[in-house]
């Protein structure tokens, strides 16, 4: 099973609605490591590392996010593998 890291920028109504908390929960449920971080432009940056299948599941979940959010756009790219412990909310 291949391991990958993906960095995604999630735009829409994603700050102040529990998006990072739910993203971290989904990531941990999938055995992923990484973080979810608010950015000054109102988007959320998500870094997810783990099995390709589980990273893809998280990316699919990010398309809708929690019910309290509205996702308008996701830009994602595969980046160099890095080891991170846990899934942080920044």
Curated annotation (Swiss-Prot):
Q: Name one GO molecular function term.
A: acylphosphatase activity
Q: What is its EC number?
A: 3.6.1.7
Catalytic reactions on record: an acyl phosphate + H2O = a carboxylate + phosphate + H(+)
Kindly state which keywords UniProt assigns to this record, in alphabetical order: Hydrolase
Q: Which InterPro entries match?
A: Acylphosphatase, Acylphosphatase-like_dom, Acylphosphatase-like_dom_sf, Acylphosphatase_CS
Return the Pfam families for the record.
Acylphosphatase
Q: Which domain of life is it from?
A: Bacteria
Cross-referenced NCBIfam families: PRK14426.1
The family assignment reads:
Belongs to the acylphosphatase family.
User: What's the protein name?
Assistant: Acylphosphatase
What organism is this sequence from? Photobacterium profundum (strain SS9)
């Amino acid at each position: 099973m291949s391991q990958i890291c993906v960095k995604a920028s999630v735009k829409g109504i994603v700050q102040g609605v529990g998006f990072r908390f739910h993203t971290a929960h989904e990531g941990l449920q999938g055995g992923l490591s990484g973080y979810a971080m608010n950015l000054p432009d109102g988007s959320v940056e998500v870094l997810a590392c783990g099995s390709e299948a589980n990273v893809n599941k998280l990316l699919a979940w990010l398309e809708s996010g929690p019910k309290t959010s509205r996702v308008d756009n996701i830009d994602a790219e595969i980046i160099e593998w890095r080891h991170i412990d846990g899934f942080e909310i920044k």
